UniProtKB/Swiss-Prot annotation:
It is found in: Cell membrane. Pfam families: 7tm_1. GO terms for biological process: blood coagulation; G protein-coupled receptor signaling pathway; Rho-activating G protein-coupled receptor signaling pathway. It comes from Gallus gallus (Chicken). It comes from the Eukaryota. Belongs to the G-protein coupled receptor 1 family. It is a multi-pass membrane protein. This is P2Y purinoceptor 8. Keywords: Cell membrane, Disulfide bond, G-protein coupled receptor, Glycoprotein, Membrane, Receptor, Transducer, Transmembrane, Transmembrane helix. Disulfide bonds join C95-C174. InterPro entries: GPCR_Rhodpsn (IPR000276), GPCR_Rhodpsn_7TM (IPR017452), P2Y8_rcpt (IPR027669), Protea_act_rcpt (IPR003912). The chain crosses the membrane at residues 27-47, 57-77, 98-118, 138-158, 186-206, 237-257, 272-294. The lineage of its organism: Eukaryota, Metazoa, Chordata, Craniata, Vertebrata.
Amino acid sequence: MVKNGSHLDAETLAMLQNKAISITLPVVYTMVAIISIPGNFFSLWVLCWHIKPKTPSVIFMINLSITDLLLACCFPFQIFYHIQRNHWIFGKTLCSLVTVMFYSNMYSSILTMTCISIERYMGVVYPMKLIKWRRKRYALGACVIMWIFLLLAFYPLESTDLTYEVKELGIITCFDVLKWEMLPNFAAWVAFLLTLFVVLFLIPFIVTVGCYIGTIRKLIQTSSRYGNKQKTRSIYLAIIVLSVFITCFAPNNFILLAHMIVRLFYEGSLYPAYKLTLCLSCLNNCIDPFIYYFASKEFYQKFMQVFRPKVPLSDSLETRRESLFSGRTMSVRSMSSGPMDGLEGVKICLQRQESVF
């Protein structure tokens, strides 16, 4: 962070010349791109063309997969930038676009995983009481609102020239040196950073943890209804999502908060550590397909058909239990409502054939 007319401090100059960062980031981004691009293309293919009907969870997973692929489009620019020792040659407009997409991916992934956890919680703990909220149009609306909110939150990055010419090194940086004028005053900087940390990370993390604890507790209490296989898949899903939060997202967000506190109040810097934690935040692109694997029974079945075709697919007792449960639910809805309500209940319960787990 630099003010008009001031020179970069020694710590920032040292960070821009740090060989560990210039080597580590391109290597990690390349590996993530190699793994995540085919994985997310396969996921998108399965989710869009092989899973019907499109339940709320599927809508959220499609949103997550598209977000991951958009981030993959940013990797070539980031890789070239760091190979060139933090020298940006693509202009200020592309710098802003790549930066916004890079950070939108992380926070969109966080919010989408939170939406999936809420949808799972409603489907397991309150399957009938909250069924009207588990509809496709609400999931689509949530995705649209999510992206509008993110674009508004990152408006300072969208409307500011994020490039900076470092005359001492003869390079032009992209986002590595922020201009103080990006926001009007000190209070605006504090509000911006707290929004990123509290609203886009801390609150979603707490909600996600609470939803999965409630979901797993309910599954354990009603294991005879859902079956051990579905309970196990739900537990695996919870473990993977929480691991992504703790491993991929938490280090970056906590280091960012600590760095900005040190920068704003003590004129120090934790930016090298922050840059390295960006590698961790990108790893979620490789992990997301595993979330789909455990979140959707149909995705799991398609995966097995493609990669393990000789293994017979059989849901046996688990499928019969789920079908029996869906049938009971449908009957109750039909008998307790009017004619149109009964038809709506049948339609909704048919959607339950796509596993709520």
